[in-house]
């Protein structure tokens, strides 16, 4: 599902919200989540899952074109872990 599909589904499910209102709601939620993660905070949505940051230490990588060794700096990457209810719902569908 894309962001625009989510907005369309939200607007269809709640007719009192216009498409612009649904778009604003999705934007505000995603912006708040991105801001929290960028500040190093963990996000937990009960029944859905949690978002946090995983540390990746510095390493030596390889340039795929030249084969030359390249130093890759340390970084933090977003990580999502599905909650128990979400895992069970997905498992029932398969």
UniProtKB/Swiss-Prot annotation:
Question: Would I find Transcription among this entry's keywords?
Answer: yes
The residues that cross the membrane are: none
**Which superkingdom does the taxonomy of this entry point to?**
Bacteria
What Gene3D superfamilies does the record point to?
IHF-like DNA-binding proteins
Q: List cellular component terms (GO).
A: chromosome; cytosol
Biological-process GO terms, alphabetical:
DNA recombination; regulation of DNA-templated transcription; regulation of translation
**What is the protein's given name?**
Integration host factor subunit beta
Q: Name one GO molecular function term.
A: DNA binding
Q: Which SMART domains match?
A: BHL
> Assembly and interactions?
Heterodimer of an alpha and a beta chain.
What species was this sequence derived from? Nitrosospira multiformis (strain ATCC 25196 / NCIMB 11849 / C 71)
Family matches, as InterPro entries: Hist_DNA-bd, IHF-like_DNA-bd_dom_sf, IHF_beta
UniProt keyword annotation of Kinase present:
no
Functionally, this protein is described as follows:
This protein is one of the two subunits of integration host factor, a specific DNA-binding protein that functions in genetic recombination as well as in transcriptional and translational control.
Keywords linked to the UniProt accession:
DNA recombination, DNA-binding, Transcription, Transcription regulation, Translation regulation
Which Pfam families does the protein's record reference?
Bac_DNA_binding (PF00216)
- HAMAP family the UniProt entry points to: IHF_beta
In the record, the note on similarity to other proteins reads:
Belongs to the bacterial histone-like protein family.
